[in-house]
Amino acid sequence: MKLIKGGVTAPQGFSAAGLHAGVKAGSSPEKYDLAMILSDRAASAAAVYTRNRVKAAPIYVTMDHLGSGTARGVIVNSGNANACAPDGHEHAEAMCIAAAK
């Protein structure tokens, strides 16, 4: 793997940030648990998905949102991997709506 100077923000028009958002209840405030990569405009986007029969709700939301082949942002969370959580679809959509603001 080759590291690119500037990382994910090396290409012009991209920015990124990470923070502690408390995605997982009780997590340490020092632990970053949410990151976002943002493009100034719609950019070509693609994803590789699991072949498992059981997929977390965010996978289905991502599949739907990437149907056009473009995106302006990517949200990454850490510390919350329960694929069978109740209301997962609603929570994933709410995260997308919050990020869009």
Regions found by a protein language model. Give the residues of each.
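Short glycine/serine/threonine-biased micro-segments
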Residues: 16, 71, 77
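Alpha-helical support elements that line or immediately flank enzyme active sites
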Residues: 75-101
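Broad gene-expression machinery/nucleic-acid interaction feature
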Residues: 31-33, 56, 73
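Histidine (H) residue identity feature
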Residues: 20, 65, 89-91
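Generic structural signal for well-ordered, non-membrane alpha-helical segments
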Residues: 29, 52, 59, 88-92, ...
